[in-house]
Amino acid sequence: VTLAGKGGEEVSASTSTFEVSFNTPIRTSLSKNYPNPFNPSTTIDYELSNAGMVSLVIYDLKGAVVKTLVQEHQEPNYHHVVWNGLNNSGQSVASGRYLLKMNAPGYTETITMTLLK
């Protein structure tokens, strides 16, 4: 860029540009499910800042797997999944508290969800 100074002399200035994207989260995170308590379904929102293998698995309080919601490679983005209160066999689960564990590259988080019938 060439500019004119006070006396009309040429003054050089450099410019730089940068791009800001609001489409990619800056951090990986798992939000609380909503509604909570829920019946018959609940929504889980999560954000990925990096691509990689992601798993969201629901466990009962004894540690047994109830439902695998996500088990796949995903791109950085804002994601959500709905759990309808069914287990991996398609059967309705009992009322009670359940643990949702999310694993993603460099990130692990567990939240508690309550199903009321």
Task: Give a label for each model feature.
Residues 11, 66-67, 93:
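Generic structural signal for well-ordered beta-strand positions
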Residues 19-34, 38-60, 68-72, 80-83, ...:
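Glycine-centered coil/turn sites that cap beta-strands in beta-rich domains
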Residues 1-25:
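Short, compositionally biased serine/threonine- and acidic-rich segments at solvent-exposed termini, linkers
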Residues 73, 91-117:
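C-terminal tail/sorting-segment detector
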Residues 81-93:
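Signal that preferentially marks extracellular ectodomain short beta-strand elements
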Residues 2-4, 19-21, 72, 112-117:
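Short beta-strand edge segments in extracellular beta-sheet folds
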Residues 2-6, 86, 103-105:
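Beta-strand-rich extracellular modules
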